[in-house]
Amino acid sequence: MLRVGRIGTKTLASSSLRFVAGARPKSTLTEAVLETTGLLKTTPQNPEWSGAVKQASRLVETDTPIRDPFSIVSQEMSTLANNIGSLIGSGHPTLNKVATYYFQSEGKHVRPLIVLLLSRALSAIPESERDRGTFDASDVTENVGELNPEPSINDPLSPIEILHGINPDIVLNPLSRPSDPLPYESNGILPKQRRLAEIVEMIHTASLLHDDVIDNSATRRGSPTGNVAFGNKMAILAGDFLLGRASVAIARLRNAEVIELLSTTIANLVEGEFMQLKNTIVDNSEIANKATFEYYIHKTYLKTASLMSKSCRAAAVLSGARNPIVDASYKFGKNLGLCFQVVDDMLDYSEGESHLGKPAGADLKLGLATAPVLFAWEKYPELGDMIKRKFDGPGDVERARFLVQQADGLSRTRELAQKYCDEAVANLDLLPYSESREALRNLTMKMMNRSK
């Protein structure tokens, strides 16, 4: 229940308020706040706009707190690791151990959480408005007994004996083992959307195994990395194996557009890593600074935002939603992914190793120029030479960190992250109101305040 009074015990975060004040079409909350206070006619061009927004933030109160995003899809998240385990099992015990190593730690699992929440939010769209393409029989919830079901996401496309390989009588992996059938629909989330969330986490984990080898990382989430625990060769092979298993699961979704989207994300991850290994700076000019920053944003999209954006679009495609919703879902994932990584780059300068669960200041030590140092470069041209030599000179890392702190590098990085955060929140406008949509907004805004 919404109450509007002179003093509210709870106020909206600034980013939430910016969304409320600029919502199009205006939400019930917007109308209640602005109309009640007589500020409905106020516009951003009006000198009183800033004061109006601040006043609105003090007047909004809701009796119904926003639920923790995880709790809304807790059932699906609680079975995530087990379901993935059934997809990636191998006949080789060592490969099993390495491939499942990162799934055993307490990770954030942000990507599958986003896919599941978005899928549930998409289920609030009336079925009459979800007519982009056709549903597979395995995703239809009514009159199941009267259908001639098409193959499910657990059924192979090729003959079992082909997938088995040389010995068709031996069961080595889940490609040929029958899986327990998934419920037709649970919590508003379709079986293919749940499988999508699992695939996304598999792709992400494979990229972590590979990244830790490339970066020679020693710890992740407070534990030894895969390359430290098992060696570089095993870690690389385990990452490859995960991508192979993910590719099989992608194919079994039997949706050409989704297959294209997810296959592209794998290529994007590799492209982004290549971009990170390369340096584009050629001189210390303003043009070089701008080009380097654009390069950084593009690399960030490929390495982080591509998987989020394309998996969000895939969830919308599987829901049957129309093109405007599908496009908005993609933009939401893109902006959220960029916000997530920009905040991550900022934390590398502001948090310690014990808090992050991984070495602090790692980017500079790896020779990487991220947003904080690129912004500081505009004020301190000497950073250009350090970027060019990848901070490999004596004292470069310490000097660069000092200059970032002296300049406005961190504050401008926060502003950039906030921009992406606000855009991601606005991208959710097209979705109908639901608990899951509000949880996505809450999750997005919390990205700005995370400390690890």
Swiss-Prot record:
The superkingdom listed in its UniProt entry is Eukaryota
Q: Which PANTHER family match?
A: ALL TRANS-POLYPRENYL-DIPHOSPHATE SYNTHASE PDSS1 (PTHR12001:SF69), GERANYLGERANYL PYROPHOSPHATE SYNTHASE (PTHR12001)
CDD domains for this protein: Trans_IPPS_HT
- Could you identify this protein by its name? Probable hexaprenyl pyrophosphate synthase, mitochondrial
- Cofactor list: Mg(2+)
| GO terms of biological process kind | isoprenoid biosynthetic process; ubiquinone biosynthetic process
Pathway named in the protein's UniProt entry: Cofactor biosynthesis; ubiquinone biosynthesis
Cross-referenced Gene3D superfamilies, in alphabetical order?
A: Farnesyl Diphosphate Synthase (1.10.600.10)
* Annotated source species: Yarrowia lipolytica (strain CLIB 122 / E 150) (Yeast)
Q: What does this protein do?
A: Assembly of polyisoprenoid side chains. The polyprenyl synthase of coenzyme Q biosynthesis catalyzes the formation from isopentenyl diphosphate of all trans-polyprenyl pyrophosphates generally ranging in length of between 6 and 10 isoprene units depending on the species.
Q: What are the subcellular locations of this protein?
A: Mitochondrion
What protein family does this chain belong to? Answer: Belongs to the FPP/GGPP synthase family.
Question: Which is a Gene Ontology cellular component entry for this protein?
Answer: extrinsic component of mitochondrial inner membrane
How cofactor binds (record note)? Binds 2 Mg(2+) ions per subunit.
